Amino acid sequence: SKDDLPKMASLRFAAATRHFAQPIRQSIDTAASIGATGVQLDVRNELKPTELSETGRRHLIRQLGEQRLELASFEYPTRRAFHDSAQLDARVAGLKGALEFAYSMGVTVVVGRVGRIPDDPDLPAYKLLCEVLNDIARHSNKVGATFAITPSSDSVEGLRGLFERITDGPLGLNLDPAGLIMSNCDPVETYRALYDRVLSVQIRDGLRDVDGQGVEVPVGRGEVVWDELLAMLEEGAFRGWLVATRSSGDDK
């Protein structure tokens, strides 16, 4: 929880409700009870735009208001990478729909994974990924909500190279300090290098075990230097949300 982190006056903390594994209305109450001021909703499995009626939407907004919670961001998870051509059109259409839904709900950021960035820009998979992300960036420009990618064992150089090739509209980064630690990357250095792309930050922790494997652990028990990272976010006047997410273990 955010109580395990140093206090930073200007930073905003949200909870990813899907990790509570509860019905959404209960999840919202749980998020409020742990001191979050915002929530991140999964708009593929938890709250499908196509299944939310106008009345349902009003009820959701009312409940959030009653609990003094804001919608921080949406998550759109996919099973396959955005450079895997199998059922790619459906994934892209789903993500575009999530961006439209986000804007209609006053949300400006949708996070998700695109798969590990291929190493060589000349590979067909790399070119396909750039084509897809430029298409999504154009859509973001049109609808007013931006896709922020959560890295998958990608280096700073790999991320920077990809961002440089997405020129048709905005593309952001969902900084995942635990994922970076588990991939042998430094979250602070990554933020320094790509700070202008960071739209959202995940609050989860990780470490490298004796075999060099990445392991997710409760916040404060891993190798993420939170004092330094949060101080840097505050100094840089970071305006996005820090979202508590824990994808494994009992102490979520």
Regions found by a protein language model. Give the residues of each.
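Conserved H-loop
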Residues: 70, 146, 239
